[in-house]
C-alpha cells in the first residue's frame, strides 16, 4: 500500500500498524472507509484517532496486535470476507495466529536472483495447505490453496 502509492480504496480498508502510521494517500479518505488496527503503546495513536475518528481506530493489544481479535472484530462489523495484502512479517504473524484460511498465489515463469525474503518471515510457522484451484495460462500459474483444518 505505502510502497506502491495506492489511492483511497473503494472498499473498506484496514491498516495494520503497531506504529499507527497512516499513509499520506489515505489521510483524506471519507470517514469509515479506513480503519486502523494498532496497539495501546503506539506513538501515533492520537494522530490516527484525529485523522480517522475514534471509532475507526481499533486498539487490539498493549504492544502486539491481537490478530485473532482483529479478524473477529471485523466479522462483527459485517466484514466476513477479508483479504490481506500485507508483507511477509504480517503474513507470518497471521499464519501463527491461525486466522488465515486460504492463500492465493501467482507464479510466473521467470527466475530472478537477489535478496528477496520468503513469503512469510518472522514467526515460525508450518501450515499444511491443499490445492483448491490451479490454473495455467502462458506458463503463469494461478493458485488458490486452502489451509487444512481452517474453518
Regions found by a protein language model. Name each.
Residues 1-151:
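Enzymes that bind and transform nitrogen-containing heteroaromatic metabolites
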Amino acid at each position: 500500500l505505502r510502497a506502491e502509492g495506492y489511492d483511497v480504496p473503494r472498499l473498506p480498508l484496514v491498516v495494520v500498524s503497531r506504529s499507527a502510521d497512516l499513509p499520506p494517500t489515505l489521510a483524506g479518505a471519507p470517514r469509515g472507509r479506513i480503519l486502523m488496527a494498532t496497539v495501546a503503546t503506539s506513538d501515533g495513536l492520537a494522530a490516527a484517532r484525529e485523522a480517522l475518528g475514534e471509532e475507526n481506530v481499533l486498539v487490539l493489544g498493549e504492544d502486539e496486535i491481537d490478530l485473532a481479535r482483529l479478524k473477529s472484530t471485523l466479522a462483527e462489523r459485517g466484514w466476513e470476507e477479508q483479504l490481506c495484502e500485507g508483507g511477509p512479517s504480517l503474513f507470518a504473524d497471521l499464519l501463527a495466529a491461525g486466522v488465515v484460511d486460504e492463500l492465493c498465489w501467482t507464479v510466473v515463469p521467470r527466475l530472478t536472483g537477489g535478496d528477496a525474503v520468503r513469503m512469510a518471515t518472522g514467526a515460525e510457522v508450518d501450515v499444511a495447505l491443499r490445492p483448491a484451484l490451479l490454473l495455467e495460462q502462458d506458463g503463469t500459474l494461478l493458485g488458490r490453496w486452502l489451509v487444512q483444518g481452517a474453518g
